[in-house]
């Protein structure tokens, strides 16, 4: 393969948890001279985000089946077959040396198409519980990687690729030693927000007063109502934003983060070296609970599932956690991070491309 520009196809879409780790790997291999093409869907976030990162993208037509009616389920085989055919056409035109499946609806047809075309398939499972698509694709994949132990019994644990600016933050000892004043609480609801955080945090802030200062990211469409709730009752310093464009800056500012426990969020909080209060989204397989559990086990975080996430419970934790303990927890979080995940995934792709 010497002298030939190697080609990677990244299959990922739908949510930031799939797309951002894929972008980290794509940029890493582009820096090593690889050519990268993204396979996505035209109506999800990757359609807008990936081109902004200077990466070409092509689309297939596929969507999820969960919650759809009987007609959609009956039509599913035809839709899936069509998506596989579209992916095969793109695959034959681009001729990748290897494909990387990061999850999302696009990975299923894309992975099958790659296998049918004889292209090595490397899968990366971001969550502590494997999704349905990756469980199926694991049977035909050349290599299977996992971010957290337990998703697959024998797959190497490589962590989640996270953004370079998060990895570049000063370690907790440098960042937090000598910091004084109210505890800085970062509340992150994700791009879609988290209603339970938006509802509870203004009351928590009102009762804690000047013991804390807050930066609360509400998610799309919730800023005005949350801002009003804070302004009507909260005396402490607070900043309310719909989105946070620079998460590294937010992590650097914070002493503790309160958030959902999506796979990428957990990995970023760990890499940044921050204590966390994780509020897993309630799902039948408890995926977000399993994502956060390793950090709770090492003493870097506390999991409060939704029935336990009460105003009193959060106030009790924030009152107990004084700065020496927060620093200790931050150091444990950073120690638990796998900071070379991008390099490990890239190495697996390079190896698979040689086979």
From Swiss-Prot:
It is an enzyme of class 2 (transferase). UDP-N-acetyl-alpha-D-glucosamine binds at residues 15-17, 127, 163, 191, 244, 263-268, 288. Its main location: membrane. InterPro entries: GlcNAc_MurG, Glyco_trans_28_C, GlycoTrans_28_N. Keywords: Cell cycle, Cell division, Cell inner membrane, Cell membrane, Cell shape, Cell wall biogenesis/degradation, Glycosyltransferase, Membrane, Peptidoglycan synthesis, Transferase. The keyword Membrane applies. Its EC number is 2.4.1.227. One of its GO terms (cellular component) is plasma membrane. It catalyses: di-trans,octa-cis-undecaprenyl diphospho-N-acetyl-alpha-D-muramoyl-L-alanyl-D-glutamyl-meso-2,6-diaminopimeloyl-D-alanyl-D-alanine + UDP-N-acetyl-alpha-D-glucosamine = di-trans,octa-cis-undecaprenyl diphospho-[N-acetyl-alpha-D-glucosaminyl-(1->4)]-N-acetyl-alpha-D-muramoyl-L-alanyl-D-glutamyl-meso-2,6-diaminopimeloyl-D-alanyl-D-alanine + UDP + H(+). It is found in: Cell inner membrane. It is a peripheral membrane protein. GO terms for molecular function: UDP-N-acetyl-D-glucosamine:N-acetylmuramoyl-L-alanyl-D-glutamyl-meso-2,6-diaminopimelyl-D-alanyl-D-alanine-diphosphoundecaprenol 4-beta-N-acetylglucosaminlytransferase activity; undecaprenyldiphospho-muramoylpentapeptide beta-N-acetylglucosaminyltransferase activity. Pathway: Cell wall biogenesis; peptidoglycan biosynthesis. Pfam families: Glyco_tran_28_C (PF04101), Glyco_transf_28 (PF03033). One of its GO terms (biological process) is lipid glycosylation. Belongs to the glycosyltransferase 28 family. MurG subfamily. Cell wall formation. Catalyzes the transfer of a GlcNAc subunit on undecaprenyl-pyrophosphoryl-MurNAc-pentapeptide (lipid intermediate I) to form undecaprenyl-pyrophosphoryl-MurNAc-(pentapeptide)GlcNAc (lipid intermediate II). HAMAP family: MurG. This is UDP-N-acetylglucosamine--N-acetylmuramyl-(pentapeptide) pyrophosphoryl-undecaprenol N-acetylglucosamine transferase.
């Amino acid at each position: 393969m010497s002298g030939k520009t190697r080609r990677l196809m990244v299959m990922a879409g739908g949510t930031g948890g799939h797309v951002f780790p894929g972008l980290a790997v794509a940029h890493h291999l582009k820096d090593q001279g690889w050519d990268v093409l993204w396979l996505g869907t035209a109506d999800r976030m990757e359609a807008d985000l990936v081109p902004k990162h200077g990466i070409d993208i092509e689309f297939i037509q596929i969507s999820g089946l969960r919650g759809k009616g009987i007609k959609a389920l009956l039509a599913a085989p035809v839709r899936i077959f069509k998506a596989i055919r579209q992916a095969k056409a793109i695959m034959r035109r681009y001729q990748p040396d290897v494909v990387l499946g990061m999850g999302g609806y696009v990975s299923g047809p894309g992975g099958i198409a790659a296998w049918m075309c004889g292209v090595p398939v490397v899968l990366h499972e971001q969550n502590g519980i494997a999704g349905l698509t990756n469980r199926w694709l694991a049977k035909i994949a050349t290599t299977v990687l996992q971010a957290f132990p337990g998703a697959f019994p024998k797959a190497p644990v490589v962590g989640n690729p996270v953004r370079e600016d998060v990895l570049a933050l000063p370690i907790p000892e440098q960042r937090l030693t000598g910091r004084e004043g109210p505890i800085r609480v970062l509340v992150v609801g994700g791009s879609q927000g988290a209603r339970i955080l938006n509802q509870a945090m203004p009351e928590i802030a009102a009762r804690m007063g000047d013991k804390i200062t807050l930066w609360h990211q509400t998610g799309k469409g919730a800023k005005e109502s949350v801002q009003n709730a804070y302004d009507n009752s909260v005396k402490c310093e607070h900043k309310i934003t719909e989105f946070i464009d620079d998460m590294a800056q937010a992590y650097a500012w914070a002493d503790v983060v309160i958030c959902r426990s999506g796979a990428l969020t957990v990995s970023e909080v760990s890499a940044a070296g921050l204590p966390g209060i994780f509020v897993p989204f309630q799902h039948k397989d408890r995926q977000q609970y399993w994502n956060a559990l390793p950090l709770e086990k090492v003493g870097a975080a506390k999991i409060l599932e939704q029935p336990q996430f009460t105003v009193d419970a959060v106030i009790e934790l924030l009152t107990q956690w004084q700065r020496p303990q927060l620093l200790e927890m931050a150091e444990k979080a950073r120690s638990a991070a796998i900071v070379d995940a991008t390099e490990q995934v890239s190495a697996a792709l390079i190896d698979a491309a040689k086979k």
